[in-house]
Amino acid sequence: MILTIVIIILTVIFVNKYLLNNGGKNDLRKVQGPFNLPLLGALYAFDKERFHKSFDKFYDKYKDFYFIKFGQHDCIVLNSPKLIKQVVIEQSDSVFERFHTPSIKRYAQGKSILGCSPDEWKKLRSFIVISFSKNKMGQQVLDKIFHTQYLKFENHIKKLIKSNNNIVTLEPEFKRLTISIIFNFQFGTDLEFTDPLIDSLLVCTEKIIASCQKASDLMPIFEIFTSYKDIDGVVKEMYALVKPFLEKYLKQHDRNNPKCALDHMINCILDQDEPKLITYEHLPHFLMDMFIGGTESTARTMDWFTLMMTNRKEMQDRIRTELLDVGIRLPVLVDKQKYPLLNASIKEIHRLRPIQPIIASRVVNDPIVLKHECSAKGESYTIPVGTLIIPNAHSFNFDPQYHKDPLTFNPNRYIGDNPEILHMTFDIGIRTCPFMSFAIDELFIIFSRLFQSFEFQPIDNTPISEEAFTINSIRPKQWSCQVIERDHK
């Protein structure tokens, strides 16, 4: 009898909340968009391996924006640069909150910048900014970190060239490079490029990304049936890897002689007034956040950039010529503007293969209005609290209305007086990644060294596939190429 009553109550809740709610809040039901099924929403219309391409299909059909349900979540997808600016930048206070899935929240535990509330995010970001503004490292020390870790990478690639008849698969080496850079930045400790700790950290970052993708993230009704033991387990595993280094710095910390990013974060904790908003318990999460976010985004950009340069010898040669013409063997960050072609090429790779083709969604925390001049039908819409806002960077990046010959790799679109359509590297608005400038600087130094030292050629002159797949981020099929060491004389 009791079981029957429970089933009836759950059924009523299910029908009320999930089957009858198909975008009926405020103006959402008026917004055009695909048909949404109960529970699934429009997930049926998406290709799992080419998720970003499915957005292109709706872009062509609905233009500026449309309503869609991802599982049980109401979403407005913004397609036009004008509309993205209007909502995400001009009304940023109303869409400040991130959408955090139950999996991300479980990983974050209230102490990670990747999965915290707006108030917590402001607190954590302010802490990071203050830590690094006090940081005496500056550009010169970052230059040293990037160059030192790159040199280990270069020597490793030379060994692979000799042992594999010049055939190298670069993706795993780029990942090791980013891990070694982040580790050195955090702890001021050098690891050998083949140190098992690098691979262990890499495995953990990939496990965390993979484990934070569960059915309950899109369909909360299944959350009570979901286990998060895998997330808890890999977080403990990764913490165990960094714990010895963290404990060492906590014991040996010299307040007057900070040597690395961790030292400066410890100083910042000590400088806080009571009660302390940030404690030592936050430190492991800051360290893990940087490994997880930095490795996937930066290494993936390195992989795509080198792949496209391998297919474009003329462009590869142009970049090397620019590097040689400036005449600086070891480029430094202060000289970055002397390399317009390289900088523009990095922007162009982010346009063609954005790591996050669909920019991280925001949650409407105050009702927002989509002004009628951006509406295809000349209307205005009030978007209610709780709706997800999804900026669709990928589709307008390939729209000839905004980019001439959008399928062509053409860095000239970002050089000189050419107008720049809204360019989104990893994100946009006030909730951008606090380490974004670190990643851009890292890419500049690595590429400035890489294309002076090596030439990349397709194997047997067969162009490498540039087809993109969505697996956590946009990535190519695994590829290899011929790597030829250049003569610096």
From Swiss-Prot:
Topology term for the membrane: Single-pass membrane protein
GO molecular function terms attached to this record: heme binding; iron ion binding; oxidoreductase activity, acting on paired donors, with incorporation or reduction of molecular oxygen, reduced flavin or flavoprotein as one donor, and incorporation of one atom of oxygen
GO cellular component: cytoplasm; intracellular membrane-bounded organelle; membrane
Entry annotated with the keyword Transmembrane: yes
Membrane-spanning residues: 1-21
Signal peptide (UniProt feature, chain positions): none
Alphabetized PANTHER family for the sequence: CYTOCHROME P450 508A4-RELATED (PTHR24300), CYTOCHROME P450 FAMILY (PTHR24300:SF375)
Protein name, entry field: Probable cytochrome P450 522A1
Taxonomic path: Eukaryota, Amoebozoa, Evosea, Eumycetozoa, Dictyostelia
